[in-house]
Amino acid sequence: MVVKAVCVINGDAKGTVFFEQEGEGCPVKVTGEVTGLAKGQHGFHVHEFGDNTNGCMSSGPHFNPYQKEHGAPTDENRHLGDLGNIIANGDGPTPVNICDCKITLLGANSIIGRTVVVHADPDDLGKGGHELSKTTGNAGARIGCGVIGIAKI
C-alpha cells in the first residue's frame, strides 16, 4: 500500500516537499524544492509537533521517540527526525532528494502530522563538539517550516 504525504514550507524559506512510502518497512522518499536559502548547507529535520501557532518555534524538538542523541541520517544512533542537510547553491531553488529508512508514514511513529523545519545553518550531524551538537546538530535558527499532511494517492 503506497502512502503519500506533502508539506508546504513557509517562512523566510519556502517550498513544497513530498513524501512517499511503498509500504510498511520500506524507505521513505523525500523530494521537492525549497527557495530563499543562502548558499551552503541547511539542517533539514522532522520536529515532534504539527503545531506552528508560534511559527516554527512551537514545533518542538526533533522527532525522537526512542530518546537517542542527534546524529547523521546514516547513523544508527540518531533522532528519527534527523534528515541531515539540504545544499543550496545560492542560485535558484534548492532540491530536496532524500531516501530514509528510519522515518515512516505508517504506524505509531508516523511523521504525518509533524513539522518539517529548515534551519539557517548546517547540521553538524552530532559531531561538531558544540554543546548543541548532540541535541540539534547546532543547525541554528528555524527559517522555514510546515506540517506534513496526508496527500492524495
UniProtKB/Swiss-Prot annotation:
UniProt xrefs under SUPFAM superfamilies: Cu,Zn superoxide dismutase-like
Catalytic activity: 2 superoxide + 2 H(+) = H2O2 + O2
TM annotation in the entry: none
GO biological process: determination of adult lifespan; positive regulation of mitophagy; regulation of synaptic plasticity
Signal peptide location: none
Residue positions binding Cu cation: H45, H47, H62, H119
Coiled-coil segments on the chain, per record: none
Class in the EC hierarchy, top level: oxidoreductase
The record's free-text note on cofactor binding: Binds 1 copper ion per subunit. Binds 1 zinc ion per subunit.
GO molecular function terms listed in the Swiss-Prot or TrEMBL record: copper ion binding; protein homodimerization activity; superoxide dismutase activity
Location(s), subcellular: Cytoplasm
PROSITE patterns named in the record: SOD_CU_ZN_1, SOD_CU_ZN_2
Keyword list, A-Z: Antioxidant, Copper, Cytoplasm, Disulfide bond, Metal-binding, Oxidoreductase, Zinc
Cofactor(s) named in the record: Cu cation; Zn(2+)
Record family assignment: Belongs to the Cu-Zn superoxide dismutase family.
Assembly: Homodimer.
Described function: Destroys radicals which are normally produced within the cells and which are toxic to biological systems.
Protein name: Superoxide dismutase [Cu-Zn]
